[in-house]
Amino acid sequence: MQDQRINLLAKNLVNYSCKLKKGEKILIEAKGVDYMLVNAIVKEVYKVGAYPFVEMFDNRVTRELLMGETEELAKLRAKFDGARMKEMDAYIGIRGGNNAVENSDVPEENLQIDSEFYSHPVHHELRVKHTK
């Protein structure tokens, strides 16, 4: 049986924080967390007649991707994820993880490339400025 606080949180995120309306599209990104909150959010999105798009990440896989990050790859990822983000009306990001130092051995140069050529254009320029 699911903790009812998860359902209440999902309801508040969708209806209060995002003020999601019928026909709107929302991207739900979850990194390093269990599926229960994501499922509860999806149910609430459907209740208002909106469209959920979900992507779940495992921090260990993200680490491996970052180990090989290049400017070219970051720009390609930004191109594809940016196109998706442009279509969204709202966004919910859920972050967690068991290992706070998961990326500690990723070269600093790779992290900078990811930040400059992926995170900044997709999240700071598109998501923050154009979604709820």
Locate the predicted segments by residue.
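Active-site bordering "gate/hinge" segments
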Residues: M1-K132
